[in-house]
């Protein structure tokens, strides 16, 4: 890919202007931020700060593919967070949820569940929640 340029960036300080990025994906990163496992500083709100930064740079009508562990909300010491479905939805009020899919705990039995429900997500211990959000046209953030 001759036009590909790879850069290093800090998810807490992305090098993009406000509302300038049309498409973002953040897959299995947020749950680790602020827990110190990968050399980052301990910050109990690190994940929320990173989410705020993703929201800052995503353009109107922009798409965000956001993947995190889903189940009963908790922090696994020095490893990762597990989020409830409702937690993730509450973090993105200025976005429309276009699709939610799930790789459940029993993925060998159930496989990939496209258009999974909140109820199925709530039954997981450590499912893989795949959210497709789209920023609404106008908001007050």
Question: Locations of the language-model features?
Answer:
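A conserved beta-strand element that flanks and buttresses the S-adenosyl-L-methionine
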Residues: 25, 30, 34
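Class I S-adenosyl-L-methionine
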Residues: 85-138
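A short acidic, Gly/Pro-enriched loop at the edge of an enzyme's catalytic core
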Residues: 12-24
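Acceptor-substrate binding/catalytic loop of class I
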Residues: 45, 66, 71-91
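Class I SAM-dependent methyltransferase SAM/SAH-binding core
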Residues: 1-14
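A short glycine-rich, Lys/Arg-flanked "PGG" loop and its adjoining helix->strand segment in the class I
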Residues: 42-63
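Conserved catalytic-core motifs of eukaryotic protein kinase domains, centered on the activation segment
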Residues: 35-37, 77
């Amino acid at each position: 890919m001759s036009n590909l340029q790879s850069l290093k960036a800090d998810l807490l300080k992305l090098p993009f202007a406000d509302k300038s990025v049309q498409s973002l994906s953040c897959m299995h990163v947020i749950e680790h931020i602020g827990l110190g496992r990968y050399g980052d500083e301990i910050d109990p709100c690190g994940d929320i700060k990173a989410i705020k930064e993703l929201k800052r740079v995503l353009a109107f009508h922009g798409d965000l593919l956001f993947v995190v562990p889903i189940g009963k909300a908790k922090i696994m010491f020095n490893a990762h967070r597990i989020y409830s479905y409702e937690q993730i939805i509450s973090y993105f009020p200025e976005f429309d949820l276009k699709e939610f899919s799930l790789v459940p705990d029993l993925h060998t039995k159930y496989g990939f569940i496209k258009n999974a429900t909140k109820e199925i997500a709530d039954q997981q211990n450590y499912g893989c929640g795949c959210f497709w959000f789209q920023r609404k046209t106008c908001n007050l953030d």
